Amino acid sequence: LPAPSHADRTSSPRLVVVALASCGIAVSLMQTIVMPLLPEFPRLLNTTPTNAAWLVTANLIAGAVCAPVLGRLGDMFGKRRMLLVALAVMVAGSMLGAVSDDFLVVLVARALQGAAMGVVPLGISIMRDELPEEKVGSGIALMSSTLGAGGAIGLPLTGVVAENLSWHWLFGGAAVLGVVELVAIWRLVPESPVRTGGRFDLIGAVGLSAALVCLLLAVTQGNGWGWTSPAILGLFGGSMLVFLGWGVYELRLPRRAGGSTRQPLVDLRVSARPQVLLTNIASVLIGFAMFTSFMVSAQIFQAPTDSGYGFGMSLTRSGMALLPGGLMMIAFSPVTAGLSRRRGPRTTFLVGAAVLATANLVRTVAPHQLVVVVVTIAVTSIGAAFAYGAIPAMIMRAVPLSETAAANSLNALARSVGTSTCSAVVAAVTTASVVQVAGVTLPTAGAYAAVFAIGSLAAVCAFVVAALIPRDAGIDAGLPLSETGQDRIRIAP
């Protein structure tokens, strides 16, 4: 079938937005479909609980590596092309997991599914290149909101499947969803004409991948291996050294586009601009603040009532209790886009950070009543919708058109580091203070209160960092993206 071209578009902007935004749901599902079943995978795959945890870790590391690589390749050779590649790899991983009971095979499948992390930044960059100016903000806000909505949908869906069908259906369903996404992108989304050309920075890709693997291994395994163990300290030290060497190498590469010039994987000169650097730091913190609720709310819903804070829900019911939060993210995406259009995306981000800080603080001190928990989860999702909807616009208004995919991918990586760090902190805090309830070891109510207090502090820090971003028309006023970014584009023939 012939692919649509930039010169001969047949899709309406609305269809392009729907096709791309639905990819956010696929990404969220890839990250969440195995989480509720982690306690069962040691039995299902004949492995240990420690090994089963790698089903999450492998997906996270693979996604962190793929995102910046696919982003740069998208800027060089076509964003839609790389988006299709990422979806194809995700489908291959899902099909592999659907047909195997071997732990190592399923582990490889989860790593392949991690390629989905590169889909969202590529899709956001396509929106900037292809949509009319008046549609860009709302499209980005919707796509960002589907990240949370997908997680909220994935948890009850996982519960239904786990309680009624084989776990293989989770991977099979992901494969079917991926194929649908592939067809939709192929038929409805035109290729962006914005290219940088040049040669791919393979050495930079290997260096960044090595540094990320060391860093994320240390963050995700620190609680199990011991934060002061030689392995964890060595991984942290190794990641710092590799990052340093990688940075020196990247800065030495020329920035000229086209021809046979090797393009740096990440343009550190652009990334070091205060607007970009501080936005990425704020993204790490906001990712942490948002993920606290996601990490522990399902545990609280499923904890026995004798714990003093739990509600004794099944996997499916706990997922349904989380669903309103995900729907709030989608419902508020037009509101976030409108606020960014009128007041600028930084104002939208500051509102989101303030809402997240307040919601986490309420979770710290509020009574353990179901209505309070469900409402605060929904409010947390609203705050995340404001913050996540603003971040891509803040990034894209500070970078050249030719750098959008790479810059968005680096920002997606920053948010991933925030959520990964949150996961490690939650594990450390909830295992440090436990109580025995009916012979089962559970975190104390104080441990969960501490988690939410830390999440509130992270949101406050994100607010402060965002407030320090230099005032600039691109982030403080509702100007079209084309009037704020610095054009360094080449139109592909």
Predicted regions and their residues:
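Paired small-residue
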Residues: V89-L96, L104-L112, V371-V379
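Helix-loop-helix hairpin linking two adjacent transmembrane segments in secondary transporters
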Residues: G150-V183, F200-G238
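Cytoplasmic helix-loop-helix junction between adjacent transmembrane helices
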Residues: L112-S145
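C-terminal membrane-cytosol helix-exit motif in multi-pass small-molecule transporters
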Residues: A175-P193, S209-Q221, S239-R256, A462-P470
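Membrane-interface helix termini in secondary transporters
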Residues: E40, P68-R72, M76, V160, ...
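12-transmembrane solute porter fold
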Residues: R14-M30, V34-L38, T47-P49, A53-A58, ...
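Conserved MFS/SLC helix-loop-helix module at the cytosolic interface between two early adjacent transmembrane helices
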Residues: V65-D101
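Helix-breaking motifs and short loop linkers at transmembrane-helix boundaries and internal kinks
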Residues: L44-N46, G78, V99-L104, L165-S166, ...
